[in-house]
Amino acid sequence: MIMDKDTFIGFACSYTPLALVHAAGFTPCRILPDGDCPDQAGHLLHDNLCPHVKRILDRALSRQIPDLTGMIFMNSCDAMRRLYDAWQVARPDIPCILVDLPTTVSERNIAFFFGELQRLAGVLEKWGGARLDPEKLAASLQLFARLAGQFEKIRARVQAGDLRNGATMLQAAYLKASVTAPEPMIGELETLLSQESAGQADDGVPVYLFGNVLPETDAFALFAECGARIVGEDLCTGSRLFTEIRVDDDSPDSLPDSLLKNYAKGLLNRQPCARTMISDRPGELAADIIRAARLSGAKGVIGHTVKFCDPYIARIPNIRAALKQEGIPFLMLEGDCTVRSIGQQKTRIEAFIEMLR
């Protein structure tokens, strides 16, 4: 197998098995809902559909995406399934695969997802990648674990407030890491970590941020301009993609099935988003937000989701009630994956921060 070092495989969900893609010899490249593209998605998708999905399709139709060897879609929601369907019409030149993603964690679902990862490994090989090898997969898992560890150290410094424009800088690093191979990114983060502490560089009101898609660094700059200091976040386009995935390979042998099955288990057990259900603890998402907000020292919580996101629409009332019961101030924002939409919320953000002072 001969492969260019920048042979990209596109993805659009934080549940994508990046280490498996990397072990096959590809560079995972997140297709973000950014860029200045004409609104064309309405020709293939309903207008009242997730703007994250529509903006990605706009980029694909406008050919404002990197040269991709293939595209991986995780079956995370109905809108993402529709994007998979539309992609085959919009970009038949870029092969794609839809990987089914269970909504709950159980032994049966882990076994099912393991089968899906095996299927993905076979497709990656058909696309020109390397055959699944346990040593290569283990090496890739170690690289992404190291990357996640570096981000954890940066997050700690951002939470402490000793990096000027910390949240904005961290988001810029997340964005770059989502389109860059882990090896060079590790070096860049080491340089970032070597910066000396600037003392209490950010003196804004500490706020915890959660939601799904909010990639724009300008949005984080706006929060800072409004007087907020983001001391913790849980976003699909932020920390959720770069937290360590626990892969406990307790098998006595080195069969690829053993490591891959544990990887499947680790992915399903990572920090859940709104589309993931914990059947015996239906309010766990709200509890996670409260726990994270308290650990970060936040005075309030801001939620930001894209419009028409059914999983979050269903969860927000319970989250709001739980935060109210705990006495934690809460502001809910909604956007369409443009800086303009978050900018329109400036007055509400400023008023919320002023209330927290």
What are these regions (language model features)?
Residues 3-7, 114, 118, 122-249, ...:
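A charged, amphipathic alpha-helical module
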Residues 10-13, 18-19, 38-42, 50-58:
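Metallocofactor- and cofactor-centric catalytic cores in central/energy metabolism, strongly enriched
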Residues 12-34, 211-281, 285-290:
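Redox- and metal-dependent alpha/beta enzyme cores, enriched for Fe-S-associated oxidoreductases
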Residues 37-46, 105-110, 239-247, 341-344:
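Short, charged, surface-exposed secondary-structure boundary motifs
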Residues 55-126:
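Acidic/His-rich segments in extracytoplasmic proteins that coordinate ligands and/or metal ions
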Residues 60, 280-297, 314-315:
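A short, acidic, amphipathic alpha-helical segment used as a generic capping/interface helix at domain edges
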Residues 68-76, 298-307:
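Acidic beta-strand-to-loop metal/phosphate-binding motif
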Residues 317-357:
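Peripheral docking tails and interdomain loops at the edges
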